[in-house]
């Protein structure tokens, strides 16, 4: 990745399906900035309580301290003037205001790193993530391995009682291995109630 010189900030987006390593990559970038003695603030959406409410945690056990917030306005209010790097976990859970907040922070010369799911369990664009990807200087799409066939997985399969979820189920359901699997395009299934009732 080429780093821009000067006071200009920028936005980096780390996206992909579940189990693709997004949180690990966010943690890696934050730790590199900390080693370089840059002031970093890490935020995560308060909906994410899977492992620890005060940490960004990967499925593999890596973790880093974070400030839980419930809106993009909270991030903008809490970012300190001398912060150089702002890291945001679970970008898909935030309101659409997160796009403008990230742009304003980058305009102030800050490096903004956002990690999140680019698609919901239906395989459709998730919340503000596609808009963040559009305005970011750098976008990295990570992939997992399909838990059915071993191919490259770009989607997240929601499993309820051992079966794929229905299209009209709620978009947000926080969970991990007990609720979601990494799937490729061919193995990803979303049931529709009318099809199932025939």
Curated annotation (Swiss-Prot):
One of its GO terms (molecular function) is ATP binding. SUPFAM superfamilies: Glucocorticoid receptor-like (DNA-binding domain), P-loop containing nucleoside triphosphate hydrolases. One of its GO terms (cellular component) is cytosol. Keywords: ATP-binding, Cytoplasm, DNA synthesis, Kinase, Metal-binding, Nucleotide-binding, Transferase, Zinc. Its main location: cytoplasm. Signal peptide: none annotated. It is found in: Cytoplasm. The keyword Zinc applies. Its EC number is 2.7.1.21. It catalyses: thymidine + ATP = dTMP + ADP + H(+). It holds the Pfam family TK. ATP binds at residues 16-23, 89-92. Coiled coil: none annotated. The active site is at 90 (proton acceptor). It is an enzyme of class 2 (transferase). The keyword Cytoplasm applies. Zn(2+) binds at residues 146, 149, 184, 187. GO terms for biological process: DNA biosynthetic process; thymidine metabolic process. Belongs to the thymidine kinase family. Homotetramer. PANTHER family: THYMIDINE KINASE, THYMIDINE KINASE, CYTOSOLIC. This is Thymidine kinase. It comes from Dictyoglomus thermophilum (strain ATCC 35947 / DSM 3960 / H-6-12). The gene is tdk.
